[in-house]
């Protein structure tokens, strides 16, 4: 499952497989590449609010949903700075209001059906365009909802993290609070009452010996008090410092409470604000855009359906009327409805965007509040640490507490001294008693032995009398250092404390010590509790050290007798109670009913009778006779009734007595049950108390471990900060080293300049060396030519090995450029990594492109504004130039006027001078001349003023002209700068356009090389996977370039860059006017520049996930196969192997025939030539078989040439003979060192089982690779005897280099028995012998199995000549013929085996005892 990565402040949602990150820093780097969150500002949390660690990157969630990781930027929690740094708050600009175009509503001819169809077509196009715009708005709205959801989830996780951190510190604060409040009260009491405690200690007398013992002999006063146990100076100093320490401790506790209160209040406010945010969340309206889009789609489908229906109309009047009616329906109902839904979609988009920006701002505020609460938590934690580390204050109050607890301490020492004294006395008394008792037992035993020896033992001699074993009791250790104290001193000490008005708590503690001194010990309590329900529980009683001679049986019999007597006593008491009850009942029943009833009736009768006698004597006689009969009857009736009542009363009494007995028995049973239930309840209560105590201790331990875990996490965080600081120092050091390197580089350049003078001297030497080098190069060329042939051969061999890697390497080269290709095993992982990097680069490039597009738009707007400003500036400049020209003309006119005035003034002055001269000469009258002079002077003054004003006006105009010139120059400079900036941005836009195009082209080529085809239709990019058959069918013979076998994309990869017709769009900026440029840019973005990065990412992601799924599947299968292999290996460890022999296997070794003496081979199927190295411990001469465990296997090849050379040179080497068994040349065989697994096994298989010689094993070669009917056709085949003979008769060199010697060659045909003795393979199948004549061959059904006729191999049980039809499941030795061996062996070439179908009554004289021995051997380890 991919992991969802959620960015808190932007609302982004990314997907990544965290298994590719080996460290958390890699994940940080990936986040930094794909998001604006830098690694140094990186914070990651899980949905539960826990910090993401390296181990949690690989931890998969238990639920099937995807795992999520929340990423935060720590700059979110920082207050906004005033230095102009960019804000972290992600604000999306509100979209422009969507202007709904009017629907087409004009028709040329209402009577022509074609006009109506054209109107329907235009309305359909209008509706489709509106649907596309609404779809885009729906996608944008859903994206905004998704961003809000991500932001709220991240805030929720941050709040959960804050709650977790506060919950971690809360137990510490609670525990500290429980301790602080009583501590403050105690400190206040100690700081005010310490003098009272000191006075109590000063006035309380104690035992001098005990004081001397407690102070280690430092205090030895005769009249000792409790004050002697402390130092008065230290006590006074502690009492002086106590108020200050108490005030300081109280201040710390108050600060702790204040910090905790502020933290909890802020946390409650934060949670309340978050609940408000959740309650007013707009996520509940996330489905509105989809519903609106569905409504719009329904309307558009209706319009499209009407359009298609209108296409089928003919030109009839009815169809025209129907078309008009449908168009009216569109105009009145569908078109307004569509506009209304589009307007609602636009309003929803505006609302969602505003809500998203609000949530983003609220999220940042929440993060800042969380940071503030976290700082308060850190302050609270520091306060807790400060309060816990108040050692000086605690030391002061500890000493004062010691002064307070002096009576208790002294009493505890007294109690301990009394207990130790009692223990010593008990040990001495019990040891003496035990010694005396054991001496009596020893004496009794000695007397008994003497009596027995005298009566019986002396019969066989006097030597049977021995000493009686005795017991010596000795007491170890000496505990006499404690002073002698009795209980009276302790009671007197308690009375002295009561007399001085000591605190009740101290008196209770001392009284409790005295009570504990009188309470029984644990063993005594156990013995007291042993008596339950009138019986003794031995488990609770324990064992006594002074039992009578330690006779458990005697003690048990006595206890049984006691229980029997107690049961008899209970029975007797029950009977006595029953008899007493019966006696009481009988006495109550035998009493008369009423002894004092009145006799009035009888007297009255007698009176009546008397009167009657007197009255009538005759009647009396008659009445008396009748009354007598009546009375007799009445008496008999009453007697019968009395007898019945007595019987009924006796029955009732018996019933009552029985019921009373049953009631008593039931009461006794209920009493016993209640007592048993009471005991059980007490036991359960005790267990409950133990469990509660254990649970409390475990909870305390859990709290302690959680606190330690939190401290450890804090230390890890501090360690990370120290790592950051260390890395910063390393970076500074690297900068210093770079500066040093630059300095060294500069010095090196200086040295190079200095060394330039030496170059000329070295050139001559270089020339000489060049000549030598040429010589060496020629020699090297010769060597290269010589090795060229070898390299060609190596290249030919390597081409076959590199063919299957070429496609991956080409893909790697396309992805990575010039990077080196990794190893074969890492190539797929590298390609995955590169694909992920390309995806990240594409996303970064798209984000950069979007930014650059925004910059480009802004730049265009600025350029446009600057151009407008430049035009306005030019207009102003032209106006100013015209004004300046006008001013210049005015100035020139004024100058001309000034010159004229000056000329006129000069003339006037000349006239004045002449007038003055004339006046002087007396030519005219003085008055007239004076008037003229005054006039001329006034005229001159006015002209001078006018001249001055005109000159000042000319100066101001010149200054204004100079100012306009400066403005013109500044505007020209700004215009040139903007033009240059615009050209620079144009170049950058060209570069970005080309890079975007090339990146899109490369990504399309990457998709094509990965087996996908890219196509575009109606502005939508589609990526489809090319089937493997189509990829293979395009170019099946070309395996060098995997890209050529893939279908080319229809988007960018169909043509080369210089051949594509769409390349004109790539140069969209080379346009004559702005409209053409805008049109080309839009066409470029729709055709070449638009690339669906999300679809590309999903495709690459799914492809990688498919690869990972296959890898996990294969890994799981490999793990299951490995487990099965381990199980099979474990099962096979104690079973006899018959193939794939290796060290540690059990093997069955059998002697061979027609070989040198001592040739024993391993029983095998398809793995011949495994011979046993004989050892003295094997004792092979006395065995018929050997089961041994392989210690070592040596592989050897028979080389007869070495033997011939050794014979020719007549030299004998000390080396071991490589052909001790006389095998054929070139044959590969194996020498096995084995150790018998069960030394001491019987030398013979069993009684009556062996009927052949020790070295003769009877078997038959009955292997067929073909049917019996095809024997004549395959005589020259490789698998026939002739083929084997030809193969074995090859040259020595070819036989050594062939691989046919590595496995056994099966042979076929019934005549193989005769051929085995007349060809070379007879020496290599010496373990097989011709079958008996009566054994039928090739008549049994074919069975699948593996069988070998290896040289020196064991006989094959599937073809044993003397064996008949085998019993099923005879033992492990028969695994050579069934499928069980194939389950644990590697797949080999299977041969068809035909078993012999001899007589079912015939038994194998060799294998039956072997299987029985094998079964006995493996029976202990059978699984």
UniProtKB/Swiss-Prot annotation:
Membrane topology: Peripheral membrane protein
Organism field: Hapsidospora chrysogena
Main subcellular localisation: membrane
GO molecular function: molecular adaptor activity; protein kinase binding
Record's protein name: Autophagy-related protein 11
Keywords: Autophagy, Coiled coil, Membrane, Protein transport, Transport, Vacuole
Function: Involved in cytoplasm to vacuole transport (Cvt), pexophagy, mitophagy and nucleophagy. Recruits mitochondria for their selective degradation via autophagy (mitophagy) during starvation, through its interaction with ATG32. Works as scaffold proteins that recruit ATG proteins to the pre-autophagosome (PAS), the site of vesicle/autophagosome formation. Required for ATG9 anterograde transport from the mitochondria to the PAS. Also recruits the ATG19-prAPE1 complex to the PAS. Required for the Cvt vesicles completion. Plays a role in morphological differentiation and cephalosporin production.
Biased composition (Polar residues): 585-602, 650-660, 1034-1047
Coiled-coil regions, chain positions: 551-589, 625-978, 1102-1130
UniProt biased composition (Basic and acidic residues): 631-648, 1383-1395
Region (Disordered): 583-660, 1028-1048, 1327-1423
Lineage: Eukaryota, Fungi, Dikarya, Ascomycota, Pezizomycotina
UniProt-annotated location(s): Preautophagosomal structure membrane; Vacuole membrane
GO biological processes: autophagosome assembly; autophagy of mitochondrion; piecemeal microautophagy of the nucleus; protein transport; reticulophagy; ribophagy
Family named by the database record: Belongs to the ATG11 family.
UniProt subunit comment: Homodimer and potential homooligomers. Interacts with ATG1 kinase and the ATG19 and ATG34 cargo protein transporters. Interacts with ATG9, ATG17 and ATG20.
GO cellular component: Atg1/ULK1 kinase complex; phagophore assembly site membrane; vacuolar membrane
Gene: ATG11
Phenotype reported upon loss of the gene: Impairs the cytoplasm to vacuole transport (Cvt) pathway, pexophagy, mitophagy and non-selective autophagy. Enhances conidiation and significantly reduces cephalosporin production.
InterPro entries linked: ATG11 (IPR040040), Atg11_C (IPR019460), ATG17-like_dom (IPR045326), Cleaved_adhesin (IPR011628)
